[in-house]
Amino acid sequence: MKIKLKKYHFLILFLIFLLNSCNINENNINQAFENEEPQTILANIPPDDPDGKYLYNPELTLNWYGYDKDGFIKGFKYRWCTLNSDNDTLWNDWSFIQSIDSDGNKIYDSNMKTFVFESPNERNFHIFEIAAIDDKGKADSSPAKLRFWTKKGPEAETELISSPSNETIVTESTNEFWKGLVFIFKDKNSKYAFKINNNQWSDYIYNDTIILTGKHFPSSGNYTIYFKSRNKYYMEDKSPLEFNVKIIKPLRTKELLLIDMTSDGIGLPGNPTDKETDNFYEMLLKDNNINFDIWDVNNEGFFPDRLKISGYKIIFIYSDHNFNTLENKFLYDDIQKLNEFLFTCGNIIISCKSINNLFYNNEQAYSFFYEIFQIEKNFNSIEILRDNQLKKINGYPTLEIEQNKIPFEWFGGLQNTQTYNPRAFNKSIYFLDSGNKINTTISLLNTKVYKAVLSTLPLYYFKYDEVKQLMKILFDNLK
């Protein structure tokens, strides 16, 4: 028994001796596996210059290098500060540069970058710091530092390359059609601010585009919008750009404006006088209990202005002659007026003998009706109406040619009927003999913003009672 105890004592003493001889403890274990900090070195061009012996351009390219004894460099973080006029320094937030991508591949040019340092004064002092980050995420706790001075940057200049009309209809917010008053500036690297009349300047926006809506303007009237820029050198434009604009906020208090764009005819079949068409549409509106005002483009000498049309919920344009005189065509600004009216939630009806007659050139017509009425650009197809009734979809009254206005036997039918092919949300209501309705003559467009009715076979030529029923349905839809 004593022999066995001696053996155990010997074994215990041997283990104690072995542990002491290895000298292993917890601190040594932690030290053996501790991650060492990476090191960062900045290139000596430009040299560290706290005293301002040299003045550099505000745009500088800096180079650096990082190494890690027990791993590899995953990236860098950098920041800098500029001494402002109050002798105070404000450090930028840290920014990061990756040296290794997600697949473990080295990213080239991660050891250099061109910076633009704010330099609004004749002499500007900066401190730049950069720290390497290793594969374990540990950063150099003593970042490499560079102190240097820059000279004043070039002056800022505010220049617009795109702006809205000097008179425009606005709404409180944008929609899928109306994008607001869009101002686009030339220099994409500058920041921009604005103010309206004598109000406060906005904060600088780091974008080459400023968009304003009706929320920026308390009421209709004339405004001056000022724009200024701050370029990448932190130079601020001392001569802000001025933009004068007449803002119209639509009231829509009136129901309908009837716009006569019919050139005067001689009263023969297919050649109505202006008075004949005027009487037809005025009676049509009165019998449907629609309150309306009249604007005769030929008598007035011009299309109604934005202020006039913005007071109405619906514009009804008719041009029922085979041709149009120059006075009864849309000028470019008239097209813009109609765009703004519709895109700010107005509704429109157009009845015409030919879409093209309303415009000075076909390209204007194609673009307007393709974008606004959502019809294909092949609306130049000319058909002959061989039946005295139009084909139609269910729910709409029959439309039959009025023989007193244009005898159906005249030239074997109603010639030169312009048809078109609706697209998107444009619903074909009346059409000629085609089963798939590609030769539409009357359609209704329903968007989330506005509604539009187009007829390329003048409503004037159809029997009055039938047109009256149709207009009641359309007016109920447009309200």
Question: What are these regions, as identified by a protein language model?
Answer:
Residues Y420-T440:
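Short, Gly/Ser/Thr-enriched beta-strand-loop segments that form substrate-interacting elements
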Residues N23-T253:
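Low-complexity, disordered linker/stalk regions enriched in Pro/Thr/Ser/Gly
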Residues F323-L414, N426-Y430, L470:
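A glycine-rich, often tryptophan-bearing local segment used as a flexible ligand/cofactor-contacting loop or short
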Residues K2-F10:
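Bacterial N-terminal signal peptides that target proteins for export
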Residues L18-S21:
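C-terminal motif of bacterial Sec signal peptides marking the signal peptidase cleavage site
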Residues N23-E26, F373-I375, G435-K479:
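Extracellular ligand-binding/catalytic regions of CAZymes and related secreted enzymes
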Residues E176-W178, K188, S220-N222, F227-I314, ...:
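Aromatic-Pro/Gly-enriched surface loop or interdomain linker
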Residues G270-Y366:
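Helical hinge/lid and interdomain linker segments adjacent to catalytic or ligand-binding clefts
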